[in-house]
Amino acid sequence: YGKKKKVSDMGKFKELIEEHPMCAGCAMTLFIRLVFLALPKPEHTVMVGTAGCGRLAISQGNVPFVYGNYGDTNAVASGLKRGLELRFPEQEKDVVVMCGDGGLVDIGFQGLMHSWFRHEKFTTIMLDNEIYGNTGGQESGMTEKGLVAKMSPRGKVDDKMDMLGLAKVAN
């Protein structure tokens, strides 16, 4: 830990995640490996995740993982970060939320926005695949307008949510 790594080192980078039960060629495992590779202090980091197949790979990593209910990842991270600050006042502990767009923006919107309003000191990473991929292909708030999916055969009617704009307003 603590050694500088580049993306070109990923083929040799196996300390944090190696084996996983994901489908062969799944982009989620690459995404998770990149996040783990970028952690400044993985030995002092706790990951928070929720429903979705990404939790299968995250939980196989050498980083503590908390599995929250669907949509409550930022609420869990808020309490976890505060608890870690009380328990380890001399050691900074990082909390990182890693979640898909459905769990974070649609179902977890309230917790996400309130963590921004309170200026909570943890990182939230959203994997925006623009659809509920695990449950059959329903549109999400992050789906582009007009996209035709299995569960929205006429195409999405509404615009994609402007999460960057909401984040700017919240801060």
Question: Which role does the model predict for each range below?
Answer:
Residues 9, 140-171:
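Conserved thiamine diphosphate
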Residues 9-69:
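Active-site diphosphate/adenylate-binding microenvironment
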Residues 18-24, 99-102, 147-156:
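Flexible, glycine/proline-enriched loop segments at strand-loop-helix junctions
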Residues 19, 26-28, 50-52, 99-102, ...:
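Fold-independent oxyanion-binding glycine-rich loops
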Residues 37, 114, 166:
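Hydrophobic/aromatic ligand-binding patch that stacks against planar heteroaromatic rings
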Residues 55-132:
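Thiamine diphosphate
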Residues 133-138:
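Glycine-rich, charge-decorated loop segments at or immediately adjacent to ligand/cofactor-binding or catalytic sites
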